[in-house]
Amino acid sequence: MTTAFDIADIKRRMAGAVTSLKQELGGLRTGRASASLLEPITVDAYGANMPLAQVATVSVPEPRLLSVQVWDRGMVNAVEKAIRDSNLGLNPNTEGQTLRIRIPELNEERRKELVKVAHKYAEAARVAVRHVRRDGMDLLKKLEKDSAISSDDMERLSKDVQKATDETISEVDQTLAHKEKEILSV
C-alpha cells in the first residue's frame, strides 16, 4: 500500500463539489425569503465595492420578508441602491437604518427558468465529481504501472473511488431534487 493515493482526499474533493452546489443553489431565489439571496450583492461603500454582509446584517423575520439592518446610517441609500440594481427584482422599503424587502411570488415561467438553472448547477457539480474520479483513477493506473500497488489493490481502490463517486452524485441528485421541489412549491 502506498501513501501516494489517498481516498480521503478524493472524497474531500468530491464533497467540495457538493458544497459548491449547495452555495450556488442557495443563491437561487425561491418564493421564500433567504438571507443567502442577498449574498452576491456588493455595495459601493467607502470608495470600494464591499459585500453586503460587511455593511449590514441580513435577517429573515418572516417567510416572505428580508430585513437588512445597515450599520452606518450614511450607507442606507447605497445599500438600497445596490439591492434595487441587483437584478433580483427586489424593491426595499426604508425605515430608518432598516430596509425591509418583501419577496414577491414567483410566476410559473420564472419557476421553470430557475429549475433549469438549478439543473445546470447540478450538472456542473456532477462533472466536477467525475473529474475528481478521473484524477483518482489516473493516479491508480499510474501507481499500478509503476508497480507501486498490486493489481488487487488497484481493483479494490478503484471500487472505493467508484463507490465514493456514486455516493456523491447521489447526494448531488438529492440536493437538486430538494431545491427543485422548493422552487416549484407555491
Swiss-Prot record:
GO terms for molecular function: ribosomal large subunit binding. It holds the Pfam family RRF. It comes from the Bacteria. Its main location: cytoplasm. Coiled coil: none annotated. One of its GO terms (cellular component) is cytosol. The keyword Repressor does not apply. The keyword Thylakoid does not apply. SUPFAM superfamilies: Ribosome recycling factor, RRF. Keywords: Cytoplasm, Protein biosynthesis. It is found in: Cytoplasm. Belongs to the RRF family. NCBIfam families: frr (TIGR00496). Responsible for the release of ribosomes from messenger RNA at the termination of protein biosynthesis. May increase the efficiency of translation by recycling ribosomes from one round of translation to another. This is Ribosome-recycling factor. It comes from Azorhizobium caulinodans (strain ATCC 43989 / DSM 5975 / JCM 20966 / LMG 6465 / NBRC 14845 / NCIMB 13405 / ORS 571).
